Regions:
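Active-site beta3 strand of CheY-like receiver
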Residues: 45-51
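Charged docking surfaces used in two-component/phosphorelay signaling
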Residues: 16-24
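A Lys-centered signature of the CheY-like receiver
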Residues: 67, 105
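Receiver (REC) domain active-site loop signature in two-component systems and cognate sites
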Residues: 56-59
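Short hydrophobic/Thr-rich beta-strand motif most characteristic of the beta2 strand and flanking loop
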Residues: 26-33, 41
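C-terminal output helix
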Residues: 107-116
Length: 121
Protein backbone atom coordinates (compact mmCIF):
# COMPACT_ATOMS: atom_id res chain seq x y z
CA UNK A 1 0.00 0.00 0.00
CA UNK A 2 1.34 3.42 -0.97
CA UNK A 3 1.36 5.95 1.85
CA UNK A 4 -0.29 9.27 1.07
CA UNK A 5 1.36 12.34 2.58
CA UNK A 6 -0.12 15.85 2.71
CA UNK A 7 2.59 18.53 2.84
CA UNK A 8 1.58 22.03 3.96
CA UNK A 9 4.13 24.83 3.56
CA UNK A 10 4.10 28.34 2.10
CA UNK A 11 7.54 27.84 0.55
CA UNK A 12 7.35 26.35 -2.92
CA UNK A 13 11.01 25.40 -2.57
CA UNK A 14 10.28 23.34 0.55
CA UNK A 15 7.22 21.80 -1.11
CA UNK A 16 9.37 20.82 -4.09
CA UNK A 17 12.06 19.33 -1.82
CA UNK A 18 9.44 17.38 0.12
CA UNK A 19 7.81 16.15 -3.08
CA UNK A 20 11.15 14.97 -4.44
CA UNK A 21 12.18 13.26 -1.19
CA UNK A 22 8.83 11.61 -0.52
CA UNK A 23 8.10 10.58 -4.11
CA UNK A 24 11.52 8.95 -4.37
CA UNK A 25 10.68 7.00 -1.21
CA UNK A 26 7.52 5.69 -2.87
CA UNK A 27 4.97 7.96 -1.19
CA UNK A 28 2.11 9.71 -2.93
CA UNK A 29 2.35 13.44 -2.17
CA UNK A 30 -0.40 16.05 -1.95
CA UNK A 31 0.55 19.71 -1.47
CA UNK A 32 -1.02 22.80 0.09
CA UNK A 33 0.51 26.27 0.43
CA UNK A 34 -1.24 27.22 3.69
CA UNK A 35 -3.39 25.76 6.42
CA UNK A 36 -6.67 26.69 4.74
CA UNK A 37 -5.71 24.79 1.57
CA UNK A 38 -4.56 21.92 3.76
CA UNK A 39 -7.97 21.71 5.45
CA UNK A 40 -9.70 21.77 2.07
CA UNK A 41 -7.53 18.88 0.85
CA UNK A 42 -8.21 16.87 4.01
CA UNK A 43 -11.94 17.23 3.40
CA UNK A 44 -11.57 15.86 -0.12
CA UNK A 45 -8.71 13.36 0.20
CA UNK A 46 -7.65 10.55 2.50
CA UNK A 47 -4.05 10.74 3.73
CA UNK A 48 -1.87 8.68 6.06
CA UNK A 49 0.28 11.48 7.48
CA UNK A 50 0.53 15.29 7.35
CA UNK A 51 3.70 17.37 7.37
CA UNK A 52 3.12 21.05 8.12
CA UNK A 53 5.13 24.20 8.63
CA UNK A 54 4.18 26.56 11.47
CA UNK A 55 4.78 30.03 10.03
CA UNK A 56 2.43 30.45 7.06
CA UNK A 57 0.04 33.13 5.83
CA UNK A 58 -3.75 32.74 5.81
CA UNK A 59 -3.69 30.00 8.50
CA UNK A 60 -0.54 29.05 10.38
CA UNK A 61 0.42 25.50 11.25
CA UNK A 62 -0.77 25.63 14.86
CA UNK A 63 -4.25 26.80 13.83
CA UNK A 64 -4.24 24.23 11.02
CA UNK A 65 -3.53 21.42 13.50
CA UNK A 66 -6.18 22.70 15.92
CA UNK A 67 -8.73 22.76 13.10
CA UNK A 68 -7.80 19.26 11.94
CA UNK A 69 -8.18 17.89 15.46
CA UNK A 70 -11.41 19.85 16.11
CA UNK A 71 -13.28 17.93 13.41
CA UNK A 72 -12.90 14.71 15.37
CA UNK A 73 -12.40 12.82 12.09
CA UNK A 74 -8.60 12.90 12.18
CA UNK A 75 -7.74 12.36 15.84
CA UNK A 76 -5.32 9.53 15.06
CA UNK A 77 -3.83 11.11 11.92
CA UNK A 78 -0.10 11.72 12.49
CA UNK A 79 0.79 15.39 12.00
CA UNK A 80 4.50 16.17 11.83
CA UNK A 81 5.66 19.76 12.25
CA UNK A 82 8.54 20.68 9.91
CA UNK A 83 9.79 24.16 10.77
CA UNK A 84 12.71 26.48 11.40
CA UNK A 85 11.23 27.24 14.84
CA UNK A 86 13.39 25.90 17.64
CA UNK A 87 11.85 27.46 20.76
CA UNK A 88 10.42 25.22 23.45
CA UNK A 89 7.34 27.47 23.57
CA UNK A 90 6.54 26.73 19.92
CA UNK A 91 7.14 23.02 20.48
CA UNK A 92 4.74 23.10 23.42
CA UNK A 93 2.14 24.92 21.30
CA UNK A 94 2.51 22.35 18.53
CA UNK A 95 2.12 19.45 20.93
CA UNK A 96 -0.85 21.07 22.70
CA UNK A 97 -2.55 21.62 19.33
CA UNK A 98 -2.19 17.93 18.50
CA UNK A 99 1.11 17.68 16.66
CA UNK A 100 2.66 14.22 16.64
CA UNK A 101 6.31 15.10 16.05
CA UNK A 102 8.75 17.94 15.41
CA UNK A 103 11.45 18.16 12.74
CA UNK A 104 13.69 21.21 12.33
CA UNK A 105 14.51 22.61 8.87
CA UNK A 106 16.73 22.01 7.06
CA UNK A 107 15.68 18.39 7.25
CA UNK A 108 17.65 15.22 6.67
CA UNK A 109 15.69 13.27 4.01
CA UNK A 110 16.53 9.87 5.52
CA UNK A 111 15.50 11.00 9.00
CA UNK A 112 12.23 12.41 7.64
CA UNK A 113 11.39 9.11 5.92
CA UNK A 114 12.27 7.22 9.09
CA UNK A 115 10.02 9.43 11.23
CA UNK A 116 7.12 9.06 8.78
CA UNK A 117 7.47 5.29 8.75
CA UNK A 118 7.60 5.21 12.54
CA UNK A 119 4.47 7.33 13.12
CA UNK A 120 2.29 5.49 10.60
CA UNK A 121 3.12 1.97 11.82
Amino acid sequence: MTLRVLTVDDSRTILAMLHHTLSNAGFEVLQAEDGRQGLDLLKAESVDVVITDINMPVMDGIEFIKNVRATGQHNSLPILILTTETSQDKRDQGKAAGGTGWIVKPFDPEKLISVIQRVVH
